[in-house]
């Protein structure tokens, strides 16, 4: 059953009360604990349902999908089932971008992904077959199939797939439904004062600026141009 969660509203006064060298650290620990508890609950559900062979993690850009998939994989492994983590980002098509009506490169549409290759490899993995997973280079927009990316999943293993379109009909909808579990996540909090000061999408935007700079060779202005406030 889907659990949509509840929007968390934090006032500027409440946040200010929790600032300080010791208070801020405590707030971070409490937030991390709540996050890990939710991940552990999902891991328990996936690990003890032996029909589940794949968990698909989806959500809007910069929601924490990669971090969550890593933590979830570790938690499932602790319950005795090995995992294989796959990022849909490695299935981008090679070559130039498509552009939207404003002339900005489109990296959000599902048409930018090689769905045929993706679904074919996922089906093979769920059948216990071996594949060579792709690796996409965002700097050169090229895709390779290095030998060290050869992979398979054991009979009791769980495949963890993270990406923007992981829960789309074109992806998870093409796979055996009784073997797949879906997880949708998104920062779901607002900072409020006399008015809303920081919305969930702005939190994600700050995360994306940091990620694009570190992992996609993209500056902050380019990110803001692509994803304006």
Each model region followed by its residue ranges:
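Charged, amphipathic alpha-helical linker segments immediately N-terminal to NTP-binding catalytic cores
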Residues: 1-44
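Hydrophobic anchor at the beta1->P-loop junction of P-loop NTPases
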Residues: 55-57
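Walker A (P-loop) phosphate-binding loop of P-loop NTPases
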Residues: 62
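Conserved lysine of the Walker
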Residues: 65
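Post-Walker A helix-loop "phosphate-sensing" segment adjacent to the P-loop in P-loop NTPases
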Residues: 74-84
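Conserved nucleotide-sensing/catalytic segment adjacent to the nucleotide-binding pocket
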Residues: 84-87, 93-144, 158
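ATP-dependent NMP and nucleoside kinases share a basic, alpha-helical "lid"
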Residues: 155, 161-213, 229
């Amino acid at each position: 059953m889907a659990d949509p969660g509840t929007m968390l509203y934090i006032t500027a006064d409440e946040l200010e009360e929790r600032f300080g060298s010791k208070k801020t650290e405590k707030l971070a620990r409490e937030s991390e604990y709540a996050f890990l508890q939710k991940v552990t609950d999902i891991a328990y559900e996936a690990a003890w349902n032996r029909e589940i062979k794949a968990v698909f993690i989806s959500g809007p850009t910069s929601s924490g999908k990669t971090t969550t998939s890593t933590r979830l994989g570790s938690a499932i492994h602790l319950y005795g089932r090995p995992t294989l983590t796959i990022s849909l980002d490695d299935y981008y098509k090679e070559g130039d971008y498509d552009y939207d009506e404003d002339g900005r490169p489109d990296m959000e549409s599902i048409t930018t992904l090689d769905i045929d290759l993706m679904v074919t490899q996922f089906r093979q993995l769920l059948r216990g077959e071996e594949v060579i997973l792709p690796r996409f280079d965002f700097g050169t927009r090229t895709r390779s199939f290095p030998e060290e990316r050869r992979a398979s999943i054991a009979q009791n293993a769980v495949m963890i797939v993270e990406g923007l379109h992981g829960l789309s009909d074109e992806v998870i909808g093409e796979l055996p439904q009784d073997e797949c579990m879906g997880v949708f996540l998104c920062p779901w909090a607002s900072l409020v004062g006399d008015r809303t000061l920081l919305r969930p999408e702005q939190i994600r935007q700050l995360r994306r600026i940091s990620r694009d700079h570190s992992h996609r060779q993209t500056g902050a202005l380019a990110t803001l141009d692509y994803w304006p406030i």
